[in-house]
């Protein structure tokens, strides 16, 4: 268990209303907007709506777990923080889907890789689904806003030997390669991002937009 300050525990002690966390919710709740899920989409949406003056309720299927709970044990993290104990798969069982089931959603348990939707993917969405407004130029200001909010920046730690070999191999093949962008502040490089960040370095929805 982390001995670092836990903003969630501090907030709860000061009276934050997290309904269903420590007590049963009231029979009726009133709000302007109900946001289902507290992950990347739900967290940012709820924050924008709340800043606009609307009363917002967030509904999350999974538990509220914070840095005080993250002990870097897969045996505890997987059944607690993931859908189907990290065993969710595609219908054909070919691909494992590591999907979060906790406050913060998958942003609580992902590995902080933060890249913009590739141009090729946007083009596919336009051609396949008619989403003509989704272009690099139209989305750029929204990406920039999210990157500022979540402190997305280049990973400053030098690559280890196997990743350096991958970079050199890509260079010899003429394939562009660079260090990934990550949404962290003061990362300790513990290597356990997938089990929740015990140091509050990961700028997930759990730490940024939801509180």
Feature-to-residue mapping (PLM):
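Conserved redox-cofactor binding core of oxidoreductases
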Residues: 2-13, 132-211
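Acidic glycine-/aspartate-rich tracts in secreted/extracellular proteins
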Residues: 63-66
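Redox-cofactor-proximal catalytic regions of oxidoreductases
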Residues: 76-155
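Short, hinge-like loop/turn segments at secondary-structure boundaries
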Residues: 73-78, 195-197
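N-terminal Rossmann-like FAD-binding beta1-loop-alpha1 element of flavoenzymes
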Residues: 31-58
């Amino acid at each position: 268990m982390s001995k670092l300050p836990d903003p969630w525990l501090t907030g709860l002690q000061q009276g934050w209303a997290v309904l269903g966390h420590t007590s049963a919710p009231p029979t009726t709740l009133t709000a302007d907007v109900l946001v289902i899920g507290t992950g990347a989409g739900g967290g940012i949406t709820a924050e924008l709506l709340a800043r606009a003056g609307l009363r917002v309720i967030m509904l999350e299927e999974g538990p509220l777990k914070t840095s005080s709970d993250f002990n870097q044990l897969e045996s505890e993290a997987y059944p607690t923080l993931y859908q189907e104990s990290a065993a969710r798969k595609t219908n054909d069982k070919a691909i494992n889907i590591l999907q979060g089931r906790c406050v913060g959603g998958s942003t609580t348990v992902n590995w902080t890789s933060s890249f913009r939707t590739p141009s090729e993917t946007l083009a596919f969405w336009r051609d396949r689904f008619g989403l003509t407004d989704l272009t690099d130029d139209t989305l750029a200001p929204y990406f920039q806003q999210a990157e500022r909010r979540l402190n997305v920046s280049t990973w400053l730690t030098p690559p280890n030997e196997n990743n350096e070999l991958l970079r050199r191999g890509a260079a010899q093949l003429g394939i562009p390669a660079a260090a990934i962008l990550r949404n962290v502040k003061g990362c300790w490089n513990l290597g356990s991002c997938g089990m929740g960040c015990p140091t509050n370095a990961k700028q997930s929805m759990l730490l940024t937009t939801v509180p």
